[in-house]
UniProtKB/Swiss-Prot annotation:
Keywords of the record: ATP-binding, DNA replication, Nucleotide-binding
Positions annotated to bind ATP: T64, G65, K66, T67, S68, Y205, R217
A Pfam family recorded for this sequence: Cdc6_C
NCBIfam families (alphabetical): orc1/cdc6 family replication initiation protein, PRK00411.1-3
One annotated GO molecular function: ATP binding
Family label: Belongs to the CDC6/cdc18 family.
Protein name: ORC1-type DNA replication protein 2
CDD domains membership: Cdc6_C
Domain of life: Archaea
Source taxonomy: Archaea, Methanobacteriati, Thermoplasmatota, Thermoplasmata, Thermoplasmatales
Organism the protein comes from: Thermoplasma acidophilum (strain ATCC 25905 / DSM 1728 / JCM 9062 / NBRC 15155 / AMRC-C165)
The record's note on its domains: The N-terminal AAA+ ATPase domain and the C-terminal winged-helix (WH) domain are both required for stimulation of MCM activity.
Biological function: Involved in regulation of DNA replication. Stimulates the helicase activity of MCM via stimulation of its ATPase activity. Binding to MCM may result in conformational changes in MCM, leading to catalytic ATP hydrolysis by the helicase. Directly stimulates MCM movement along single-stranded and double-stranded DNA. Does not bind DNA.
Self-association state and partner proteins as the record states: Interacts with MCM.
Length: 404
């Protein structure tokens, strides 16, 4: 058998440095974010005068440049001032006071602290000692800070504020990044008053601004003339429709270039962008489904198979009956009808189902659901979970409903 990779080994029509379009790449220029950069630099510049800067809360929707701009500015600060250390904390991963203290302590010392096992007061003392010993200013970036607060209220912020205020020789400031403008409304007033924060808002990009951003990246990724202007315009328009999401527009362009390279095409046109969008949306759908809790997956699977049986309207009671059958078939204990109703509402909030409440007069209100995306695609992604892989829809009985 010929080597199946041989056809990719020859000279490619398009040569591209796609790493410059990856999500973790931090560019050296930020079109249309000059004001936000200047605001952040002004606040952090107090370090250059030997003073601890105010805490900063960065607000903005997904894809508005919050994280990359913050990383860029703090990188420039470290280059300008040798007595600064920056600790980046992804709150999707580090979501407790303990884990955040571990991240800070490990950045300030050579010996790693275990991520579990120490009492919180011990890890706090160790963090204070290590930070003091360095003699540096510490900037703690809390990316997706809203996740942290939603999970444990203001506990993590309280620990950080304690670190900032209890020991004079510990010079720690925080930059919180969030897409939730109400994030601080749910924390204790005493914590909020001690936060002493300044806010920087990243507004959504418009299509023209996203076009500038894509063009500035492409200048370093590809040779001239490889991407049609119409393709850039389309990419920018799609990003602008998604609340000014430059990240999505850049991802679409990266996928479009990958498609062109694999297919040995010599240009990126609108066709490649449309192909990229379809692939992108399928990837997003697959990821959204893969991260659902087990019983949410079973409920979604039940909604899909119930809709296959009764395409016109799928009501909560029918979904629950099929959910219970699927649980019995796969050996899981079913949750209560009330809990399943809550999970159905959550799936609608995630955009995986459409919910319709109807007033049926003397029969009361009824709630029905329908699947947003292609049912077969959703089922395929659900059955990728090994817990559900043995499901056979042929076992589901045909239900009889008498509509009123």
């Amino acid at each position: 058998m010929d080597n199946p990779f041989a056809r990719f080994a020859g000279t490619r029509t398009i040569q591209a440095n796609l790493s410059l379009l990856e999500e973790n790449y931090v560019p050296d220029s930020f079109p249309h974010r000059e004001n936000q950069i200047n605001e952040m630099v002004t606040i952090l510049s107090s370090i250059m005068r030997g003073s601890r800067p105010s805490n900063i809360i960065v607000y903005g929707k997904t894809g508005t440049g919050k994280t990359s701009t913050t990383k860029y500015v703090t990188k420039m600060l470290v280059e300008a001032a040798s007595n600064v250390s920056v600790v980046y904390v992804n709150c999707e991963i580090y979501d407790s006071p303990y884990s955040i203290l571990v991240a800070i302590a490990n950045s300030a010392g050579e010996e790693k602290i275990p991520e579990l096992g120490w009492p919180i007061d011990r890890i706090y003392r160790e963090t204070v000692e290590r930070v003091e010993k360095t003699g540096k200013f510490f900037i703690i970036i809390l990316d997706e800070m809203d996740r942290l607060i939603k999970k444990n209220g203001g506990d993590s912020l309280y620990v950080l504020l304690k670190l900032m205020t209890d020991v004079d020789s510990v010079r720690v400031s925080m930059i919180g990044i969030t897409n939730d403008t109400t994030v601080l409304e749910n924390i204790d007033a005493r914590i909020k008053s001690r936060l002493n924060q300044e806010s920087i808002v990243f507004p959504p990009y418009n299509a023209s601004e996203i076009r500038d951003i894509i063009s500035s990246r492409l200048d370093k990724v590809l040779g001239p003339g490889v991407v049609d202007d119409t393709a850039i315009n389309l990419c920018a328009a799609i990003g602008a429709q998604e609340h000014g999401d430059a990240r999505k527009a850049i991802d679409l362009m990266r996928i479009a270039i990958e498609i062109a390279i694999r297919e040995n095409r010599n240009k990126i046109t609108e066709n490649e962008i449309y192909e990229a969008r379809e692939r992108y949306e399928m990837n997003v759908l697959r990821e959204a489904i893969s991260t659902l809790p087990l019983h949410s997956k079973i409920v979604l699977l039940s909604a899909v198979v119930t809709q296959e049986i009764e395409p016109n309207s799928v009501i909560t009671g029918e979904i629950y009956e099929n959910y219970r059958r699927i649980c019995d078939d796969l050996g899981f204990s079913p949750l209560s009808p009330r809990r399943i109703s809550d999970l159905l509402t959550e799936l609608a909030d995630y955009g995986l189902l459409v919910m319709d409440d109807r007033n049926m007069g003397k029969y009361g209100r009824t709630r029905s659901f329908s699947v947003v995306h292609q049912a077969e695609t959703i089922k395929k992604y659900l059955l990728e979970d090994e817990n559900l892989s043995m499901f056979k829809s042929s076992k589901m009985p045909k239900q009889t409903r008498f509509d009123t």
